[in-house]
Amino acid sequence: MTKTFLQFLIDMKVTEVEYIVQWCEEHRSYEQKYKEQMCFHMCELFGVGHINCGLMENYSVEYTAQKLKELCQRAGKYIIGVEPMPYSGIPNLQKGWEVVKASGCENAMLILDTWHWVRANQPYDILTPEIAEKVISIQINDAYERPYADSILRDESMHDRLAPGTGAKDTAGFVKMIKDAGIDPKVVGVEVISDEILGRGINEAAAYTYENTEKVLKEAWPELVD
């Protein structure tokens, strides 16, 4: 490693930790328990306050809320950010909110992502003040007009998302919804998972994503980039 690269690592700020999954299982594997503890350790190491979590398995709201409560108790001082994903056991804002609310935990919150939002066919006018208070962070990107088939929707999520503002789903509108709801996200993440963009090379992919993200934020929420 060069001195320049080492200095870059020292100066780099880690803002989020992920990804805890399978937290609803009655008998969690050693690997999942270890991964969970590693996430807690990474929060301590890097000074991060919340952990992104997903759930692929589909259970009732009541059961999921109980398991979320148990996870939040294990997390202690750290916030558990539940991320609704359309192909998961928490497919949309409605179920995500119901689970978080029913858990009764102060450190149970929501993470909202542009791609997951639009692929769940949700309009930009359904955030209530009560739900808004439980949003810890957001992730922005964009999507094509037509989604992949439901059976392979996760493939689109993992390989073919678009940079903010470069697709058909109005990333700026998503950001404005967050702003207008009075949400103060701890993190505004840029989650562009794209084989095509990454195939251009890391430098070009980073520059392209940064430039388009900046355009969206300057349009929708200029205070974030001032």
Q: What do the PLM-derived regions correspond to, one by one?
A:
Residues 1-5, 35, 173-174:
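Alpha-helical scaffolding within the catalytic cores
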Residues 8-110, 119, 201-208, 212, ...:
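Active-site acidic/histidine proton-transfer and metal-coordination neighborhood
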Residues 30, 93-94, 118-185, 199-204:
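Gly/Pro-rich active-site loop or hairpin
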Residues 43, 80, 113, 138, ...:
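Conserved, mostly hydrophobic/aromatic
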Residues 54, 141, 191:
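Conserved residues at the C-terminal ends of beta-strands
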Residues 186-198:
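Short helix/strand-capping connector loops at secondary-structure junctions
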